[in-house]
Amino acid sequence: MNRATATINVTALKHNLSQIKALAPKSLAWVMIKSNGYGHGLVRVAKALSDANAFGVACIDEALTLREVGIKSPIIVMKGFYNEAELSQFARHRLGAVIHCSDQVSLLEKTNLTSSLSVWLKIDTGMNRLGFSVEQSPAVYNQLKTSSSIQKPIGLMTHLADADNENKTFTELQIKRFFSVTEKMIGPKSIVNSAGFFAYPNALVDWIRPGIILYGISPFGINYNSFKEKIEKKFRPVMTLSAKIIAIKNRRQNDSVGYGCTWSCPEDMPIAIVSIGYGDGYPRHAPSGTPVLLNGKICPLIGRVSMDMIAIDLRSQPNAQVGDDVILWGEGLPVEIIAEKAGTIAYELLCKITQRVQFIEIEK
């Protein structure tokens, strides 16, 4: 009873992919399942999303895990390869690679592969992280075209740095740069992430790369409301994180609650102790007042988050009982709200769920 539970609704996951495909019917879906499927389970997500056109993972280990469990769909490794041994595995296991630096090009030229490789040339249009500059990209593209180790045509991609910003100036500049530099290049193109998918319909080219929206979470957080209604109407949260009440206490006015005595009862009142803490991945920096959902009603967090427990104010739920489920985020309580309260983003909360949490799959 005292383990927190992450309930993964695989029906919602499939639904979200179908919505993405319906909204971009001319594009193929290269779905992002890196970082353990955004915390939802790498293999679980891949098996549920069998209708995806390709999977995107961060590193070769994630790709090999998918191949080992029988996933045969195209898999593209976003960070590519870094030595000859890895490159050989890419060929052996039919993995696609994002090419973003000259060292990778050199490895391709000097390594004898058993089969040719599917690659995507990453063009840095302003993210300033990975990729070849706009000025370098034509020469690299021409160099890759001559390689017998590479399947043709070569994929062409960029990554948007600021697509979740209501100010569109920089993102429009990135898109303009990408279209300009690739004008004379032949190959499938890919530009948008989840935020770009909604905000920049002109960039819905051959391939789209949905990530956080697959899991029913807005890429805009709670501050950018232009697409709020559309997202809430069409997409469903996949993960619901819950834990049970393990104790109920009646505290007196001015009693403090939790480490550091940071919160005191304003009056005589009931509180509940809930079996979840930062050891499970609940954010330690969530402040008093952060909402949880108990029997359909909001109750506020009180006091500091401990490793294994939190305390909540029961004044609005005086009939709560030990064993009742408390929803920390998910169905009925968007994780974006919790992230905002904790001063972080939903992505981080999802990815920080620990092994102590029990995962359950449902179809609902």
Curated annotation (Swiss-Prot):
It comes from the Bacteria. SUPFAM superfamilies: Alanine racemase C-terminal domain-like, PLP-binding barrel. Its EC number is 5.1.1.1. CDD domains: PLPDE_III_AR_proteobact. The modification N6-(pyridoxal phosphate)lysine is found at K34. Its cofactor is pyridoxal 5'-phosphate. The active site is at K34, Y259. This is Alanine racemase. It comes from Coxiella burnetii (strain Dugway 5J108-111).
